[in-house]
A protein has these predicted regions:
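The feature marks the mature, well-folded catalytic cores of soluble enzymes
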Residues: 1-306
Length: 306
């Protein structure tokens, strides 16, 4: 049976990271201030390089693509949204909500695949023209071992394409709706991977964000069926990106839970103890990237299974 986790990942080193106006319309985690683009980029670059160094030092095989200034892709640091890889020597390309994020696609990812001779490319990106979006492992939290796709439906996660993905990949669909409170209003959470994360033996879940109690129970039931120990997190902890973690395995077979320093500081002792039963926690400081990009450690990592 295939594992849910990998040792090999791809990350994109930013050339001009910045607050993205096009994504801010439904990513309420993005914040802005009067810092210059240069200041933001310089801080993000330091955080990125330190994160790569920490990952390598703990035994993760990190492949890095250096982004270019042209075309300007302010969110290129989050490559997991536009492609995913799978054990069947398959790469899936996804349709993106923001027009400037569509420019992130690059054939340079193929340089890091072990076997490109019989690569199966599943390309859904043309569905952008029909305003149908499914933003990779931002929209999809995949349990690769049990072949389940958890998806919080939103402007960036279309159920029609979710159905197609699940049929093509042989996954069971677990679709639901999750929300956050913005100015006393319940607004859709833009990506599933900010409120949920999948490990081999545990799952992190903000159940409180799933307002529909039937949907909430269905998600919990699927996780319990697969004997996942659930780490329940609050909506406030989602704001600290505790849902945006990723489990990797190092070169010695030790499971590593990568999360931001912001997320780590939000952990309760009980939550920390559950995760540390199975994983070594690796906190990384990406506060600039979180603030202006509205994404955290998990968003920065594209897993390579081929």
């Amino acid at each position: 049976m295939k594992k849910n986790i990998t040792n090999k990942i791809l990350m994109v080193r930013p050339a001009l990271f910045a607050f993205n106006e096009e994504t801010a319309v439904n990513n309420y985690y993005q914040k802005r201030d009067n810092k210059t683009v240069e200041e933001i980029q310089n801080s993000a670059l330091i955080e990125f390089d330190k994160m790569v160094e920490k990952l390598k030092n703990i035994g993760i095989d990190v492949k890095v693509i250096q982004d270019t200034k042209e075309p300007h892709t302010p969110d290129s640091i989050f490559p997991n949204n536009w492609f995913s890889t799978h054990y069947s020597n398959t790469v899936v390309l996804y349709p993106m909500f923001a027009e400037n994020r569509r420019l992130e696609r690059t054939d340079r990812i193929y340089d890091f695949f072990d076997n490109v001779d019989d690569l199966n490319v599943v390309d859904y990106s043309s569905l952008e023209k029909e305003n149908i979006f499914l933003e990779g492992t931002g929209a999809l939290v995949l349990d690769r071992k049990n072949k389940k796709a958890y998806c919080s439906l939103s402007q960036r996660a279309d159920e029609k394409l979710l159905d197609i993905f699940c049929e093509d990949a042989g996954y069971k669909k677990i679709a639901f709706h999750s929300y956050q409170t913005i100015n006393d209003e319940r607004k859709a959470i833009y990506h599933t991977n900010v409120m949920m994360a999948m490990g081999e033996n545990y799952a992190i879940l903000c159940a409180d964000s799933i307002d529909n109690l039937e949907e909430r129970a269905a998600v919990i039931n699927e996780l319990e069926k697969d004997k996942k120990e659930i780490v329940y997190i609050s909506e406030q902890q989602v704001e600290s990106f505790l849902g945006n973690t990723i489990e990797l395995v190092n070169n010695e077979g030790v499971n590593i839970c990568v999360m931001s320093a912001t997320a780590y500081s939000a952990l309760t002792d009980e939550q920390k103890n559950i995760i540390e039963k199975y994983d070594v926690i690796l906190p990384v400081d990406v506060h600039t990237i979180e603030k202006y990009g509205g994404g955290s450690a998990r968003c920065m990592i594209a897993e390579l299974f081929i």
